[in-house]
């Protein structure tokens, strides 16, 4: 089992709805450009039936060096998070139980 790539998504659009390869690639790239720019502007991206992407701030917290056991601070940072929607969770769970 491999990974699904942007090229795979574009190829799926070619096969399923008959877009040209160039149009499919442009559509996939355009979609990700919109998601990326929305997150850069700190807008939440809500994809109905799929899930939500959002930018969050993580505050500094204590950590530990696993080799030495020495306590080290983990610096504050900005992260992108994804929360799957209930429909996506249910479909994946149903598939995994088959």
Curated annotation (Swiss-Prot):
GO cellular component: cytosol
Transmembrane segments: none
Keywords: DNA recombination, DNA-binding, Transcription, Transcription regulation, Translation regulation
Tagged with keyword Methyltransferase: no
Disulfide bonds: none
Main function: This protein is one of the two subunits of integration host factor, a specific DNA-binding protein that functions in genetic recombination as well as in transcriptional and translational control.
Subunit field text: Heterodimer of an alpha and a beta chain.
Protein name according to UniProt: Integration host factor subunit alpha
